[in-house]
Amino acid sequence: MKYSDMIVPATQREKADPRQVENSAGGYVYEVDSAARLRRFLVLGTEGGTFYASQKDLTKENVSFLKEYAAKDPVAFYNVLDEADADNIAPRHSTLLLALAVLYTHTDKQEVRDTIKARFTSFVRTGTHLFEFVEYVTMFRKWGRGLRSLISSWYTTKKPSDLAYLLVKYRQRGGWTHRDLLRLAHGTKDATSEVRNVIDYAVHGIVTIEDASKTGKFTTVNDDVLPEVITQFEQAKAGTLSPVDATALSWEMLPTEALKDPLTWVALIQRGNLPYTAMLRNLGRMTSIGVFSDGPTLRAVVSLLTDESRVLRSRVHPFNVLTALKTYSGGHGFRGSLSWTPKQPIVDALDAAFYAAFGNVEPTGKRINIALDISGSMGARLMDSNVTAREGSVAMAMAMLAGDPLTTDTVAFTSGAGSWTVPSLRQRFAGYPSGITEIGLSPRRRLDDVVRETNLLRMGGTDCALPMLWAHSNKRVYDAFVILTDNETWAGSIQPMDMLRTYRADVNPEARLIVVGMTSTGFTIADPQDKGSLDVTGFDASAPAVISNFIAGRF
């Protein structure tokens, strides 16, 4: 069947929906309002329609819209930030911190600033967040009474033990230290005496009783004065406390030399001081120094990795587990010279954890068409990973099926054979349905079996419009098309965005398009003014959440 019977070229320049507006090119798109633009910025880190897996620097030059919105309607701006934080839609907290800094420095409404101060520790939860916020806010203003009071409140409103933990775990970033910030804020009069002791430690370090009598500084190492985490941190740093006995310290707080000792990691595993994702990141390091050379520790870590309740509590995405599996089984990292001989029980445990993590995928409630590019170049590896683009795309499809099993279809696509003519355009379009193969995908199938199946399919060029052409031809109704490719579309002669507009006009006006460039080549397809299209350039651990939130209409 030829598509010329179904495609109506004129629909690109006609309203498919009363809510559409005319763009600068004479076409009709859904207008992106200010709140939607802000939500998109919080998720993507840009005002356009592209999510970059390789994080780009956030600077004051790329937030002109944010400044205008903050000055015009600061209450609405704040409400978007509050909702986005509560819904956890920003994969990188940096974008929310930058937006918060813009709002704080560009509103003249004192009640908005007061609200920010009252909720400051909810947005700025860790020491790293605080350092980032200060870096951003000082791009727009100098230190004044209001900013000093705001930063001071981050320290003075916490419990002594909580503040001590944050000071020790997040000691510096981007050239800032807590000592710097406290000296600039110079306002801790609202702190309790216990909190003031912790603040004195951050500014002056440990001061002995003898030194205190000379300098007038009160802070001492006495357990009655400072929380245990500071005491143990200083003792471990000085070598007077074995890391094995430093029960109050997380692995990030321990001296670098201590992390070269297998017994340190054994103690962390036995105490449960190693969160699930931290364990995934450090499996190679632990193997390289012999942590798993004894049976009991190896069995313990296998048990932790395969504990389904721990997997679900960690909320780790299957793609992240797959990355850990491929990295560990590969026997080397991608930064530095670290290498190891993989332990097969750990490889098997990670394989089991991959499937267990499907339980962490939240449903979108949408009808989805997942299209897997099967061109030969999909064998390329994703950035900083042993995962190939083909493996990553299949894993992503399996995860999405786990979230919406009854409303998701999966197809493999390449450029189809043949062509058809649209007389009104005096053009011939390539891409018959022969380029589409439906795949019986399920989260219960083995990943390697599905990858093997897609490898056997006929390969050709890349035509990212073809999945929508196929759905249009077969009258399949979808809310979203997710196209997983590694290459710029080139084989077809109708643009994917044009095909999306045709599909919207004839089938579903609300249909969304996500084109995921698994290996970033810098190309983009989405119209940045079209709220229903998104490019994902490159693929990393944060990309699945971006895709899911976009399909669900959360930004």
What are these regions (language model features)?
Residues M1-T388, D404-F555:
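Long lumenal/extracellular ectodomains of secretory and single-pass membrane proteins
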